[in-house]
């Protein structure tokens, strides 16, 4: 194997859900491994959670054994994981992987994470009068302590330092969460960090994108069916059975998990109590899970593709073509040759 070359760029592989990123990443790691060891950094907000294997399409133990993987199974579903934490972890891992003489390969579909890594993290969002009006209306009906309880679910760090009646600060924290999807505490962590700690990170970006959207839609449907057959419902039932999780948590808002949780809630309301772990979901509920889960996943894929198309510097491979993986591998090798001594 060639000696490590620090001039080689970090490689990023992005794409919509069900585009075949995991298989492509493993093939790419095998090809690159002939010249330099490769380690994969996951860029996926669902894969960070333990106990969420089926619905997140988590790489199998065999796949993770074939190539070192990072940022998988690093959080309990009760915990949040922000874009700021991802950037901090990814930058640290890139340095550690480089120090081992290996090449970082960042793979995933959480575009907020990629954006934060490539561009640096945005400043805290500005106030939104419409969001504030909705929060004020809820507070008038439920009281600020109720909204403080909600804040504790999505941003426990901020909630812990605020009194239940601190309406102004509770409103701002929930406003930031609703606008950005990130807890207020994550922005404070950025502001307190060392200069440049969360700046942009240079990567050569490659993407897998379908030429035919119907091809991806069909793959999404088939994969969701495979998840259901593999025990996805039981996986969510086991998470519910813990008793400390709820649907407002970031982990439980992941596509697929939200739809299964909602179906189980519906069955609990209409069938005399919550289903026990392993109990079958009624046919009506199963139909709803499939319909809503597939639709939500397709919407996610649409948003991912829209984000990718805003990145003109990417190298795109058509993932719905027969030789897609081989073409991707060749494109990455050519890019690395440009940096070879």
Swiss-Prot record:
Region (Interaction with substrate tRNA): 44-47, 168-172, 253-258, 302-309
Catalytic activity: adenosine(37) in tRNA + dimethylallyl diphosphate = N(6)-dimethylallyladenosine(37) in tRNA + diphosphate
Binding site for ATP: 15-22
Entry EC number(s): 2.5.1.75
Keywords for this protein: ATP-binding, Magnesium, Nucleotide-binding, Transferase, tRNA processing
Annotated site, Interaction with substrate tRNA, chain positions: 110, 132
Function text: Catalyzes the transfer of a dimethylallyl group onto the adenine at position 37 in tRNAs that read codons beginning with uridine, leading to the formation of N6-(dimethylallyl)adenosine (i(6)A).
Subunit structure: Monomer.
NCBIfam families, per database record: miaA
HAMAP family referenced in this protein's UniProt entry, alphabetically: IPP_trans
Protein name: tRNA dimethylallyltransferase
Source organism of the structure: Verminephrobacter eiseniae (strain EF01-2)
Gene giving rise to this polypeptide: miaA
């Amino acid at each position: 194997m060639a000696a490590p070359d620090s001039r080689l760029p970090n490689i990023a592989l992005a794409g919509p859900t069900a585009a075949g990123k995991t298989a492509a990443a493993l093939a790419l790691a095998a090809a690159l491994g002939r010249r330099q060891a490769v380690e994969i950094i996951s860029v996926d907000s669902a894969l960070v959670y333990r106990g969420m294997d089926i619905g997140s399409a988590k790489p199998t133990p065999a796949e993770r054994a074939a190539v070192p993987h990072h940022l998988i199974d690093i959080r309990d579903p009760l915990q949040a994981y922000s874009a700021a934490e991802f950037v901090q972890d990814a930058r640290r891992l890139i340095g550690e992987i480089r120090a081992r003489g290996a090449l970082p390969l960042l793979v995933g579909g959480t575009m907020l994470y990629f954006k934060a890594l490539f561009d640096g993290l945005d400043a805290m969002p500005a106030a939104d009068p419409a969001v504030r009006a909705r929060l004020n209306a809820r507070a008038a009906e439920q009281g600020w302590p109720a909204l403080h309880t909600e804040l504790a679910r999505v941003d426990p760090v901020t909630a812990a330092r605020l009194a239940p009646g601190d309406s102004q600060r509770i409103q701002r924290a929930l406003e930031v969460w609703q606008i950005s999807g990130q807890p207020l505490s994550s922005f404070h962590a950025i502001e307190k960090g060392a200069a440049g700690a969360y700046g942009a990170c240079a990567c050569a970006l490659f993407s897998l994108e379908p030429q035919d959207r119907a091809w991806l839609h069909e793959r999404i449907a088939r994969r969701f069916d495979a998840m259901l057959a593999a025990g996805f419902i039981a996986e969510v039932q086991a998470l519910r059975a813990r008793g400390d999780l709820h649907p407002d948590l970031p982990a439980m808002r992941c596509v697929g998990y939200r739809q299964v949780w909602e179906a189980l809630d519906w069955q609990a309301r209409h069938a005399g109590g919550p289903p026990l772990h392993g109990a079958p979901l009624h046919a009506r509920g199963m139909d709803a899970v499939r319909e809503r889960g597939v639709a939500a996943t397709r919407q996610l894929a649409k948003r991912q593709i829209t984000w990718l198309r805003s990145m003109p510097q990417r190298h795109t491979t058509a993932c719905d073509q027969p030789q897609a993986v081989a073409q991707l591998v060749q494109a990455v090798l050519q890019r690395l040759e440009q940096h070879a001594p």
